[in-house]
Amino acid sequence: MESQLYIKRGKAMKNHLEELRKQKGIKQEELAAILEVSRQTIGSLENGRYNPSILLAFKLARYFEISIEEIFIYEEEKEHE
């Protein structure tokens, strides 16, 4: 039997976006404008309902001046056959 790593489909990654945004003292609307996305996108990211595109993940990392891994929590689960 071989084990494989996978990400559950339909499950958004956990993240530290809300706390990072609040540390900067900005509103969702302000962050959305800076990143050129909607406020709803920021809200969905913060609430774990949406995974960002790779481009948006990089924009967030550059804005907060930290790595993508410091914003998003990537969890793998082992699948046993």
Regions picked out by a protein language model, each given a short descriptive name:
Residues N15-I34:
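Short basic helix-loop element that most often maps to the first helix and adjoining turn
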Residues E30, T41, E70:
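Residues in the helix-turn-helix
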Residues M1-K11, F72-E81:
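Short, charged recognition helix plus adjacent turn
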Residues R49-K59, E77-K78:
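Short, basic-rich loop-to-helix N-cap that marks the start of a DNA-contacting helix
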Residues K11, K22, Y50-N51:
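Short amphipathic helical patch at the helix-1/turn junction of helix-turn-helix
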Residues V37-Y50:
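Recognition helix of helix-turn-helix/homeodomain-like DNA-binding domains
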Residues L55-E70:
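DNA major-groove recognition helix of helix-turn-helix/homeodomain DNA-binding modules
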